[in-house]
Design a protein with these regions (language model features):
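Extracytoplasmic/periplasmic substrate-recognition and gating elements
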Residues: 29, 51, 55-56, 156-158, ...
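Short, solvent-exposed loop/beta-turn-alpha elements that line the ligand-binding surface or hinge
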Residues: 109-121, 189, 205-229, 277-280, ...
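C-terminal capping/gating helix-and-loop segments adjacent to ligand/active sites or protein-protein/ligand interfaces
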Residues: 139, 306, 365-419
Length: 425
């Protein structure tokens, strides 16, 4: 009995003395992850990613935070302050650089280089995910925020057989729909929805005016004739919206939209996943780009991403390596986007198969064309173009403008420029 105890003690001592690298090899890869994705197509997609990680031998521990992004960010901040950040978390756009200064992150450069990944994704995304010159986050999926969904039943009521190509054509069609008793614009009443409407209008008027005003915050661009024109168009949108949907999600109006009681929905490509999740039929919807007065493709980009936080535990470090490799794989991106209605981050994915929708194929083609012609823009309303404080200040102005018709377009332009000045200090 004494010999047996001595053997056990010797074995335990040997294990404790084993090199850390050997213990790391024995650790089962584990990922702790927090996000706001808990339901709908986003919830289904992230659950699918977790299952794939488990199939590859990992452990997936997702802690969804109910509510909007603010609640998730508060949880993340609390975990970081407590010295217990998750292995990975939802984070996007310029906030990746901001938050990387709060806590140490994982250098993903070797994995990205081995996958040849950087050359496969839009250049606008590269800088956002490698602040200070190193990859610390990875994009998961891409959406176009300027997608036009048209109710075919509504189109039939007014004899429309094609999508408008210019804002003048859009306005004429909306006028006909209103005369026919159709609410021309299906909308939501949430802040980001209001903010999207300006980027939709401005990107369809002039690509470079958008880049200068909303991405570079150039004072002249913020007060330009194109910006005034965008505010005029935004007022038209507001007049054609359902005023009874205050503070509600746009999906509340989708049943009316699918029946033809509402005509046109300007939304991100994710609406495809929402429509399918609600049991709607995409055959009842024409999906294309919002009007482009310049006659050239423009892609206003929104991307969901994960940032990887430095952890010393071998199992978490191994889990981060496994997760990062999976996120860059073509088949994983295909499955994720097919679930949510997005398009893959990789530009080399073939979308000709039956699992993809016509809307996804069209958006992917526009992304590739815009990528080649350098007409890819970053979304303001979805925190891709600016940091949260500046975005919030601008959205405040836009929300007030949309819901208060006493504010003139000229006043709207002036207030937006002033809000930017104040937010920048």
């Amino acid at each position: 009995m004494l010999v047996r105890r001595r053997n056990l003690l010797a074995g335990a001592a040997a294990l404790a003395a084993a090199p850390q690298s050997l213990r790391a090899q024995a650790a089962k890869p584990r990922v702790t992850f927090i996000s706001q994705w808990s339901a709908g197509s986003d919830g289904a997609a992230i659950t699918g990613l977790g299952k794939r990680l488990e199939e590859e031998g990992g452990i997936w521990q997702h802690s969804p935070v109910p509510g909007f992004t603010t609640e998730m960010m508060n949880k993340l901040r609390a975990d970081i302050i407590a010295g217990n950040p998750p292995a990975a978390s939802q984070l996007k756009g310029p906030e990746i650089a901001v938050w990387s200064k709060i806590a140490p992150t994982v250098n993903l450069d070797p994995l990205v280089a081995a996958a040849g990944y950087e050359k496969l994704i839009p250049a606008e995304l590269v800088g956002l995910h490698k602040p200070q010159g190193h990859w610390i986050a990875l994009p998961m999926q891409v959406y176009r925020t300027t997608t036009l969904f048209m109710s075919r039943p509504a189109m039939k009521k007014v004899g429309a057989d094609k999508a408008p190509k210019t804002w003048a054509e859009f306005n004429a069609l909306a006028t006909e729909m209103k005369k026919a008793g159709i609410t021309p614009v299906a909308n939501g009443g949430i802040r980001w929805d209001d903010g999207m409407k300006l980027e939709i209008a401005l990107s369809g008027i002039n690509c470079e005016a958008y880049r200068g005003a909303l991405m570079k915050l150039d004072p002249k661009a913020l007060k330009s004739a194109e910006m005034l024109q965008a505010f005029v168009q935004l007022r038209k949108f507001a007049d054609w919206m359902d005023p009874a949907i205050a503070a509600q999600h746009y999906s509340v109006n989708l049943p009316k939209f699918l029946k033809g009681e509402m005509g046109m929905l300007m939304m991100g490509g994710w609406a495809q996943g929402v429509i399918k999740n609600l049991g709607g039929n995409l055959d009842d919807v024409l999906i294309t780009s919002v009007p482009q007065d310049e006659g050239k493709p423009v892609f206003v980009l929104n991307a969901d991403s994960m940032i990887f936080w430095a952890r010393k535990e071998p199992d978490l470090a191994a889990g981060q390596q496994l997760l990062a490799k999976l996120m860059m794989q073509k088949d994983v991106q295909e499955k994720y986007s097919q679930t949510t209605g997005s398009i893959p981050v990789r530009t080399d994915v073939d979308l000709s198969g039956p699992a993809w929708t016509d809307g996804q194929r069209e958006a992917s083609a526009v992304l590739n064309d815009s990528f080649k012609s350098k007409r890819v823009l970053l979304s303001l309303a979805h925190n891709m173009a600016q940091t949260n404080p500046i975005t919030a200040a601008m959205i405040d102005v836009l929300t007030e403008y949309v819901h208060n018709d006493k504010v003139t377009p000229e006043q709207g332009v002036a207030r937006l420029a002033a809000a930017v000045d104040n937010a920048r200090g």
